Amino acid sequence: MEGRKFRPSLLAGMLPGMSFAEKAVLITGGANGFGRATGARLAGEGAHVVLADIEEEAGRQAAEEIGGEFIQCDVRDPEASVAAVDFTVEKFGGLDIAFLNAGISTGCGLVESFDLELYRRAMQINLDGVVFGINAAVPAMRRRGGGSIVATASLAGLTAVPFDPIYAANKHGVVGLVRSAGPVYELESIRINGICPGFSDTRIIDGFKEGLVSEGIPIIEVEHVVDGIVDLMASPESGNCHFVQAGMDPQEFRFRNIPGPKAAEA
């Protein structure tokens, strides 16, 4: 498979001499969407890719198509994340890159349509899955001398989402997690960043895609988001979030600093 060539704007921020060839990569939520497309891109660049997903049939098919490996993984279970990392290390001798991408829509509201089971499922997959993924990946990357972790957040992690506050809550959690963990593990040459796409052409918008189109809201192509993902994987930065919008290059979101405390007047 011939790898897609990076645009010059993406290459500028890459680590000197960074290549995906022979890198060991683990991708959760790898059976479809961003996970599958990123796996295909990296495999085309010569990486050794493990796709992890709870959907076994679709995951195995995706792995076969890109020439990678598959392991069934429920990211709600911390032991499953450890097993996925161990599988990658066993197959390819280590772990260089982890793309923590598993995610779902909420399926319930905050009050009238609130459902405790759906709420917990969304929080476990979208937020706990990233926590467990980092927890499992960091020790393996330490043994490798460093690595890169990218977590899928969302524009919902950067702004208010009145129609799905629970989804916004777990995606804000992912943003806060990578911003806080990134500077800590950067000291060990392990970079942790987040990717925050807008409405993209994946299954997560299937229930309201028609409405978006009718309102004239552009749907982002999956490959455009993958551009931003692979850019972050190769970037020297850590603790940052990049957003992806239709018609714009993926770019860093600039958070405002909170003013410091003011000393009390004597």
Protein language model regions, located:
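The beta1-alpha1 cofactor-binding region of Rossmann-like NAD(H)/NADP(H)-dependent oxidoreductases
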Residues: 56-57, 73-83, 116
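Active-site helix of classical SDR
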Residues: 134, 170
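Conserved mid-core segment of classical short-chain dehydrogenase/reductases
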Residues: 13, 105-120, 163-166, 206
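Active-site-adjacent segment of SDR/Rossmann-fold oxidoreductases
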Residues: 159, 168, 180-190
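C-terminal helical subdomain
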Residues: 6, 194, 211-255
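Catalytic Tyr-X3-Lys loop
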Residues: 112-131, 150, 174
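Canonical Rossmann dinucleotide-binding motif of NAD(H)/NADP(H)-dependent dehydrogenases/reductases
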Residues: 17-49
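Residue(s) in the substrate-gating loop at a strand-loop-helix junction
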Residues: 154
